[in-house]
Design a protein with these regions (language model features):
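Short beta-strand elements of ligand-binding domains
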Residues: 10, 76-83, 110
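Alpha-helical interaction/dimerization surfaces of two-component signaling modules
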Residues: 18-22, 40, 99
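Output/docking surface of receiver
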Residues: 32, 84-124
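Acidic, metal-coordinating helix/loop segments flanking the phosphotransfer/catalytic sites
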Residues: 32-48, 52, 56-58
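Conserved phosphotransfer cores of two-component systems
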Residues: 42-44, 68-75, 103
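Conserved phosphotransfer microenvironments
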Residues: 51-74, 82-83, 88-95
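The C-terminal output helix
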Residues: 119-136
């Protein structure tokens, strides 16, 4: 698969290897702190942005808000994910998904822990981004 453009991933250090592995053909910028994400947004144009629920003490909502306020990123696909164990109820996860979509995310992908979770994460990220980005 040819290189399709830079991807910004904002999530916790524990998921870096897994999430980078989902985009082996892309130029990935991986950040673990909110201010690094803001700096990254000003230095390049990304074709896709992935934000984890647990990113920098749960600043996923704030980062998505800032991204959507940038004219340059109004149409950039943003996928939010939960890939670490949490104590959220089904209702809370549903509420987060609903809020993310209302705020302009393309999707909120929820991955409960279990066997082959890394493979499931990559499969779903590819599916959602291929549908929404169209390979551009």
């Amino acid at each position: 698969m040819p290189h399709r453009g830079p991807v910004l991933i904002a999530d916790v250090p524990d998921l870096e290897a897994v999430l980078r592995g989902c985009f082996l053909q892309d130029d990935v910028v991986y950040v673990t702190r909110y201010h690094d994400a803001l700096a990254a947004l000003t230095h390049r144009k990304y074709r896709l942005i992935v934000i984890g629920l647990h990113f920098d003490h749960s600043t996923m909502f704030e980062l998505l808000r800032v991204i959507r306020e940038h004219d340059e990123y109004k149409k950039t696909p943003v996928v939010c994910i939960r890939a670490l164990p949490s104590r959220l109820t089904d209702e809370a996860r549903h509420g987060i998904r609903h809020a993310m979509l209302l705020m302009g995310a393309q999707a909120f992908l929820d991955f409960p822990p279990g066997p082959a979770v890394a493979e499931r994460i990559c499969t779903e990220l590819r599916r959602v981004t291929d549908e929404g980005v169209g390979g551009s």
